[in-house]
Structure formats: C-alpha cells, structure tokens
C-alpha cells in the first residue's frame, strides 16, 4: 500500500513538474552533438557575459551539472542564482525566481527527494495562484528569462528566443531589457534566410537604454556591412569609452576592427579581454586567427623574415591553446599545419593535417583541406604524386568552387611541365584525360594537350597564402 501511495505521489509530482517553466521543460540540448560542446559554447563562446546575466548563467550551469549527474553542484548553482536574483531584482524577486524554483523541484525529483521537490512546486504554485494560475503564469519577465537562456544556448535557439522577447514586448513594449533581447536575437538571425533586418530593433533598444554598450557594438557591426562605416566606428568608440572593461563590448569591437583590416587594433582589444578571461579558448582562437591574417599580410608585402617568424610564433601559440582545449574548431588544425609548414616543422605540420582529416568535415571544409595538404606535399615535401592525388580528390568534391578551380589549374600546370619534357608522359596524359572528363570537354585529348602546352608551364612558389 505504501508503495502504491509513493508511486501515486511521484506521478502527481511529475505531472506538476511538466507544467513548470524550467530548463528541464525547454529542450535546450535538443540537437546537440554532445554535452561537452554545449557547455563549452554556453560558458565560453556566447557573449553578453556581464553581471546582469549571472542568475541566468547559474541556472544554465545548474542544468548542465544535473545532466552530468553532479547534483550537489547543481544545487549550489541554484543557490547562487537565488542570491543574484535577490540582489539584482529585489522588487521582482518572487516572479524572477520561478524558473530557479522549478529547476530546484526537478533536481530534487531526480534525486528521489520528493518532499523537497514538492516544496518548490508549492512555492511556484503560491506565486502563480496570485495570478489565477496553478503552476505557470504568462509573465513577460518569465518570457524574458527564457529568451536570455535560449540566446545563451546557441544558434539553434535564436528563433525561439526572438519569439520569447516579442511576446514579452507585447505586454510591455517600452521595457529596455526586453527590447535588448529582441535586438540581439534579430541581429543573430540576420545571417540566415529569411533575412531579418535588425537595424530598427537595435536602434529601438539603444533609445530605450542608451547605456547598453553591447547593443551599440552590434549596431555598428551591422552598419559596417551596410557601408555606413563612419557611424559604426563612432558607435564602437563610444561603447569602448563608456564600457572599457566589458568583455562582450571588447570582443564585438575587435570583430569590427578585424573586418576593416585593422588587425593590430583587433589584437590589442582581444588581448585586453584575455586579461579578464585568460582561459577563454575562443579569445585565443580569435587572436590566433588575427595573427595568421597578419602573417598572410606580411608575406604578401614581402616583409622582414624575422617579423614573419615572430607573427607565426604568436599565431601558433594562440591557435594551439584553442585546439588543445577544443579540437572541433573549424579549420584550426589545418591553420596550424600550414603555419608549422612555413617554419619548416614538417612533422608537426603532418600531425595537424592528419588531425584535421580525421574529423567529420563538411564537403566545403574537406575540399579546402585537400587543397592545403596538396600544396604542402607539392611545395614543402616535394612529393608530386601525393599532391596530385589530393588535388584530384579535392576537385571531385565540387569543381565549380573557387578551391576546385585552383586545384584544376594546379593539375593542368603539373601536366604542362610533364608534357614539356615528354609529350607522351602517361601521368600527364592521364591528368589531362581526367580534366577533360571533368569539364565535359568533347575535344580529343591530343587537341586538349596542345592547348595546355601553349598555356605555359610556370608553377608559382608556395606560401601560406597559396591556396
């Protein structure tokens, strides 16, 4: 009988829990590759990490710790969230705490501590009953909290985050926090079809809260894309002056300067952010990519070798920090491979190329990798056969792309050189036949060979930029 009563209590409790607005009912990790990737992105990649979102972050951390089975740590984060809410939203503490209390209830439920879970369900119920609802209320503050949570959780949550902020603004259209959330969500969704012009939401958010420096930076980045660079730079300068230590502002400003080609200013800002967040692998990644861009710049201009070596060392140091902490960064291993090849450290270059090949790559990324590795084999390793193999494999992926065209040209030049020495070279003729088939060229192979011979046989020298 006691067992039946316990089961009935559990089922009743679970029914109540499903009605709560909580991280446990929002499906935040739906579609994620791994919990590690999710946690890394939430804690390190996402911006707006400043003080006003500490309670939001604590609730997300509590949810992650629960998913890992670290229940004591989860409860610890929920206690921190409560404290931040009391401190930052004293006049709305009850409503702002509903999500946290819901998370408490879920954690205790999974621990089998049903009485404590019921205690938090009842706390939610008491507040909601003031609004004539048993376990959830339609509160703009709750919609806002869900919106911020979803924004922190990555790109696949941006659309739902935008809906949350729109819903909150319907009830309170002049609320600065709700307007900021909508502006940020609109900015992020602008890169995906259907395009959503974020300029008006961004300007409205600034009108409602002129002190929101992060939103100013986002508006500046959008204006830069619209070729309104002067206004964009003015907004960034103003934001940096008023919030010189805000890491989200600094990172956004660095992005703007990097786009304009002012790599030194971008690096200076990112290093400043790194002082506040020394272990943030995304900052190391961005700094490393800036140094890599400077390497390409100096190399193109024929700069001093010592300067080039210094820049390569900086690029390697930061990119290695990022790669060692998160091996899934897009192209970072191949960047490292090319940089090591530049300084003659071929074993390290080979290691990072193979590391990149071992990943699950998109067709575009795989084609770029075949191009880079083919260049490495051709120019550094002097292994023509391997280079040809990788250029052929790369061209097969997408011959119409920029990379595909480069590899077709390289294969043709290699065939030209062979034919200039021996017009019957079998490897050269095989290459030309492959290219002829690739281009669906119906001309005879011999005629095609004559045309290729006339086009010259020069292969340019290799460099990191030679892609």
Task: Label every model-predicted segment.
Residues 53, 94-96, 136-143, 174, ...:
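Structural signature of alpha-solenoid helical repeat junctions
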Residues 42-50, 84-95, 127-139, 204-208, ...:
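Flexible helix-coil transition and linker loops at the boundaries of alpha-helical arrays
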Residues 65, 108, 150-151, 186, ...:
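Residue at a conserved register position within TPR or TPR-like alpha-solenoid repeats
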Residues 83, 126, 167-170, 204-207, ...:
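Conserved structural position within tetratricopeptide repeats
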Residues 36-43, 79, 86, 122, ...:
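Alpha-solenoid helical repeat scaffolds
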Residues 25-42, 67-86, 113-129, 154-162, ...:
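Helix-turn-helix repeat elements of alpha-solenoid scaffolds
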Residues 100, 178, 215, 249, ...:
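TPR alpha-solenoid repeat register
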């Amino acid at each position: 009988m006691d067992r039946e009563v316990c089961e009935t209590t559990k089922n009743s409790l679970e029914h109540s829990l499903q009605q709560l607005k909580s991280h446990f009912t929002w499906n935040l990790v739906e579609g994620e590759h791994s919990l590690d990737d999710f946690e890394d992105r939430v804690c390190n990649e996402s911006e707006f990490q400043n003080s006003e979102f500490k309670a939001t972050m604590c609730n997300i951390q509590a949810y992650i710790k629960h998913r890992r089975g670290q229940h004591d740590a989860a409860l610890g984060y929920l206690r921190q969230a409560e404290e931040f809410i009391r401190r930052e939203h004293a006049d709305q503490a009850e409503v702002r705490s509903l999500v946290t209390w819901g998370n408490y209830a879920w954690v205790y439920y999974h621990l089998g501590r049903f009485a404590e879970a019921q205690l938090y369900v009842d706390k939610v119920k008491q507040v909601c009953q003031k609004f004539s609802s048993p376990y959830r209320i339609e509160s703009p503050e709750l919609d806002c909290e869900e919106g911020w949570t979803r924004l922190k959780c990555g790109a696949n949550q941006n659309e739902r985050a935008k809906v949350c902020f729109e819903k909150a603004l319907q009830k309170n259209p002049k609320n600065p926090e709700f307007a900021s959330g909508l502006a940020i969500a609109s900015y992020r969704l602008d890169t995906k079809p259907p395009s959503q012009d974020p300029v008006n939401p961004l300007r409205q958010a600034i009108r409602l809260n002129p002190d929101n420096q992060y939103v100013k930076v986002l508006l500046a980045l959008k204006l830069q894309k619209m070729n309104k660079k002067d206004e964009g730079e003015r907004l960034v300068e103003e934001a940096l002056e008023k919030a010189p230590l805000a890491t989200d502002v600094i990172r956004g400003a660095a992005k703007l300067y990097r786009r304009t080609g002012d790599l030194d200013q971008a690096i200076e800002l990112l290093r400043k952010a790194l002082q506040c967040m020394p272990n943030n692998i995304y900052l190391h990644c961005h700094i490393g990519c800036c140094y890599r861009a400077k390497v390409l710049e100096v190399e193109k201009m024929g700069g001093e070798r010592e300067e080039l070596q210094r820049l390569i060392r900086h690029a390697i140091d930061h990119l290695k920090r990022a790669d060692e902490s998160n091996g899934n960064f897009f192209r970072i291993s191949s960047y490292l491979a090319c940089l090591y090849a530049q300084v003659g450290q071929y074993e390290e270059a080979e290691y990072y190329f193979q590391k990149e090949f071992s990943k699950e790559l998109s067709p575009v990324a795989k084609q770029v990798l075949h191009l880079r590795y083919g260049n490495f084999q051709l120019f550094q390793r002097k292994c023509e056969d391997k280079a040809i193999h990788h250029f052929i494999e790369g061209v097969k992926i997408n011959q119409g792309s920029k990379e595909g065209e480069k590899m077709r040209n390289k294969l043709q030049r290699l065939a030209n050189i062979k034919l200039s020495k021996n017009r019957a070279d079998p490897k050269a003729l095989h290459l030309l036949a492959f290219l002829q088939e690739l281009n669906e060229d119906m001309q005879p192979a011999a005629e095609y060979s004559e045309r290729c011979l006339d086009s010259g046989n020069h292969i340019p020298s290799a460099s990191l930029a030679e892609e």
